[in-house]
Amino acid sequence: MAKMREMGYRPYVDGMNRKDKLRHRNIVAGDPQNAELLISAHYDTAATIGIPDLRIPRNFPVYILSQGAVLLGMLLISLLIGTAVGLATKSGDLLILTFFFAYLALMLLMMFGAANKHNVNDNTSGIAALLETMQRLSPEAREKTAFILFDHQETGSRGAKSYGAQHVEVQTMKLLVDLNCVGDGDTFVISAPKMAQDKPEYAAVRESLEENAMASGVSTQFFGRAGVQGAGDYRRFVCGVGVSAYHHSAGVGLITGRIHTSRDTVCRQENLDYLAKSLADAAQKMNDL
């Protein structure tokens, strides 16, 4: 928030939903109700138990296999713990109980355990790109652009859901471009539902992303929302657009594999500059309409 104030913005913490025990703290700069373009990123940090969160947006069979492998690994660990306790106590009941609670503990640790100290791509990169975009906007474009930093994305996009519930017009009508894991990889996947694609604001965003791609050393791939696997805050908005970066891997296709581990230490400055320039250009095009 201090950085936003240095740039002349007036950020504030959006009103928390007192009925929600997680007490989301979404940070907002600008006027989302009257803006033509919303740009967002999540600022909460994922918990980690050392298992990578493989993001595979376009290869559904491999995506399912990767998720199944994680679950199988957790089941095996839980079974080993349960078996050890069962053998030590010579109790089948304790074996079953220990297995169940060990699996439950692993699930909870994945969501609410120790925060990952290495989060360069997820999602420091998204925040950095958003802040750089804020810096580049002209005074006129600032009037038509708003920014939201969502809380609790890692626990099921709860912050974005809460914000949408309290601001229904924004949730249903406004184009929102969400930057998540945009630092590691040179291929950008942009996912947008039909309602977003029909908006002139989306046309400006897409045009700017395509215009700046080659000079920035990146490529872009555009899909409908149904054509991309994975969660994200943008899915909580009717006209939400997801933007993420990926690598190409033989036999898998697009993939990002370091997040939620100690190896999440990579962010290409070229990616941040590319997104900031493209989104600033798009905002200026909207202002010139």
Language-model region placement:
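Acidic/histidine-rich catalytic neighborhood of metal-dependent amide-processing enzymes
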Residues: 5, 81-201, 220, 228-235
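A non-catalytic alpha/beta surface segment that caps or lines the substrate-entry region
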Residues: 1-34, 50-86
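Short glycine-rich anion-binding loops that position phosphate/pyrophosphate groups of nucleotides
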Residues: 42-46, 182, 248
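Conserved beta-strand scaffold positions in the cores of enzyme catalytic domains, especially
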Residues: 11, 147, 176, 240-242
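An acidic- and aromatic-residue-enriched active-site/binding cleft used to recognize and process polar
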Residues: 16, 44, 150-153
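Active-site-adjacent substrate-binding region
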Residues: 185-289
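Short alpha-helix boundary/capping segments
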Residues: 59-65, 118-122, 267-274
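Short beta-strand element of the alpha/beta-hydrolase
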Residues: 36-42
